[in-house]
Amino acid sequence: LRVRFGSSAAAGTPQSSLWLGGMTGWWDACLAAAFAAGLAATCGGPALADEQQPLAQACGGDEFARGTVRRILDGRTFVLDDGREVRLAAIEVPTLGGPQDPAAVPKAAAAALDALAGGDEVVLRRAEAGSDRYGRLLAYAYIVRDGDQFLLQQELIGDGFARVGARIASTCSGDLLSREKAARAAKLGLWADPYYGVLNAEIPSDVLARRGQFALVEGKVASVRESGATIYVNFGRRRSGDITVTVLKRNERSFAAAGLDLKALAGRRIRVRGWIEQRGEDRAWIEAERPEQIEIGD
């Protein structure tokens, strides 16, 4: 099976193709069915760039480096020709898939990044954190072709190979969240696998089962309370067995500046993204450090 990549002629980006051989389980079945129906994009084949509108504002800070992508390590990490490792900021790409085929989505994401950027020049713009604990550069990476620049994070999110992460530049958060929503609605890429779907806060056991993982959780807020230096946004009314989103009170001002009144969330439906933690025996927690992690439900 081959999934076509490319862009509009106006952008001057040559088309390339990606071999997705060797995959098993739901991914193979989905691709086979989709190709038979002429709907390859349903399973997340990267969409043509002419279907992606340019970002209203550039993601990231100043340009700090350029280089050629020499090697892909995973769906969000690559090595430049000078040996530096770069980790794409603002996105999360699964390192393990669902129980049916754990390797499918991570393998597809890495192959997608290779097809988009392998051997090409990239421009790196600063992320809020310059590097991670492993010394890898954290950056917004723009691929350069024929003088035009395309944000890799934008392409991976829009084609369903990545989710918007918990730390994202506010200048382009709305755009990337919108692209994720469209990919989710169209069941592109990882969104074709129910394992990666938005978790229901009314089923706490499903959320708790993802402890240690990045996930999206949606539900109706039962209450908002304060204690000490923390604001607690509770999906349930019990002290145990439910889900809580925590926000440090020192961060409340940044949420308010983004138009998010935390204390007015009771009774509202929200979607929160972040890392699932376990507190006590049966309570799931998500720490929200930034307003972009919380969306008001449709």
Spans of model-derived segments:
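Bacterial N-terminal signal peptides that target proteins for export
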Residues: 17-33
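Bacterial N-terminal signal peptides
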Residues: 30-42
